[in-house]
Structure formats: structure tokens, C-alpha cells
Amino acid sequence: MIFTIVITPVWSATTDAYVRKVFEWINKTLSFSRKVCIASVFIGVLMVLASKFVYGMWLGRGSIDISYSTTGLIFLYISFEMLYKVYGTIINGTGKVFAQMILTGIIAIIYIPLAIFLANLCGLSGVLIANVIVFALNYAWSKLQCNKLISQTATGIWNK
């Protein structure tokens, strides 16, 4: 939640900085956003470690058992989602969203059969693994495009 509060205003501020070609500000903001994301991931690790205790207090001891693997996979999914948001927010601010539109569509097409396959193979964990995979892919391409945009080397699909 804290990460979302920090990252939300970056979109419109990036638009202004990109139009004015103030790439130094974008780089500093990207660096700060990454630091907030890393801090959030660190807090997430602590939350995973304390999850059994918290679940017991919240839901009642012995009422339900949520495995560390389920909690850990949700943590990984949320971590990759935050990493994607660091770069995706900058990309959205530049307005260069054509690659995002195409790649998100491709990833959505991949996700459904992947989630079904992994769910049949691993149950709930399979669906969570599919989430981790698609957000890891989103993170990878968005980091690539964002770095190209900031370094002003984006061409083709990355600059549309």
C-alpha cells in the first residue's frame, strides 16, 4: 500500500519531465522508486516469516493452515508486480505504450493456458506460479523499455 501511494504521482510528473526532456529527474525518480520497492520487498520478507503467527491471530489458531509456499508465492507475485510498476509508471508517463499494449496482450494469452496447466499440475501453487511468471515477464520487458527511453536509445516498437 505504501509503495502504491509513493508511485502513483510519478506517472503525471514523468509526463511533464519527459516533455521537457529532464531525464536527470526521471533517473533520480526511478532510483528512488527502486529503493522504495526494495524496502517494500524487505518488509514483505519479514511478513512472510511472521505469516504463521499473524494468520493464527487473525483467523484463529488451527482454523486454517496457509502454507509458507502459498505465502511465499504470493510474496513473489506482489514483488514482481511492484518491480513492474516502477518501470511501467515511467513508461506510461512517457506515453510510449504501444509495446506495453502488445506485450500485455501476448502475456495474457500465455497466462490462461499456463495457469490452467500449472493448476492441474500443482493446484493453487500452480496458479500462483503462473502469476509469478507473467509478472516477471512484465518486469523484464518494462525494465528494458524504460532504460531505452531514459537513455534515448529506444527505436521501433520501444519508442511508440
For the regions a protein language model found, what residue spans apply to each?
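Interfacial segments at transmembrane-helix termini and the short loops linking adjacent helices
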Residues: 49-79, 125
